């Protein structure tokens, strides 16, 4: 069973485990990092290149996460939330119609954007009836409610890339 929205999904940022960050106080300041004071015979200046490289790596990682997060920012969050609620409702209703859990459900594809592209309510209803042809329970109420819920929704188009 799948519910297709037509939009891309934001990739979750994963942190590279084991990366260490060293903090360095300004030269002439008091107190070094715990890391530099734990090495015998090393000074703050000795650990400065390590701190700079580690900090640069962290900044790069944050920039990567920020770039990945831009995908959801370009979509209207309110529309995404409405779409997610609708998809969860569809999965719940299909579970009731087919009388089984999501994992056991036959492969039913309801493409919300495809429904929104349809020219009329009749065409949308027809597409839904085709998708639910294997359902043994009455689907009219589900179709009516789904059409009511998508009324006024906008199609999620892929985000436009900004030209640099």
From Swiss-Prot:
Has over 600-fold higher inhibitory activity when phosphorylated, creating a molecular switch for regulating the phosphorylation status of PPP1CA substrates and smooth muscle contraction. The main inhibitory site appears to be Thr-72. One of its GO terms (molecular function) is protein serine/threonine phosphatase inhibitor activity. InterPro entries: CPI-17, CPI-17_sf. SUPFAM superfamilies: Myosin phosphatase inhibitor 17kDa protein, CPI-17 (SSF81790). Residues 50-62 have a biased composition (Low complexity). Keywords: Acetylation, Membrane, Methylation, Phosphoprotein, Protein phosphatase inhibitor. Residues 1-72 are annotated as: Disordered. It is a peripheral membrane protein. The modification Phosphoserine is found at residues 25, 33. The modification N-acetylserine is found at residue 2. GO terms for cellular component: cytoplasm; endomembrane system; membrane. The modification Omega-N-methylarginine is found at residue 27. Residues 1-19 have a biased composition (Gly residues). It is found in: Endomembrane system. The modification Phosphothreonine is found at residue 72. Inhibitor of the PP1 regulatory subunit PPP1CA. Belongs to the PP1 inhibitor family. This is Protein phosphatase 1 regulatory subunit 14C. It comes from Rattus norvegicus (Rat). The gene is Ppp1r14c.
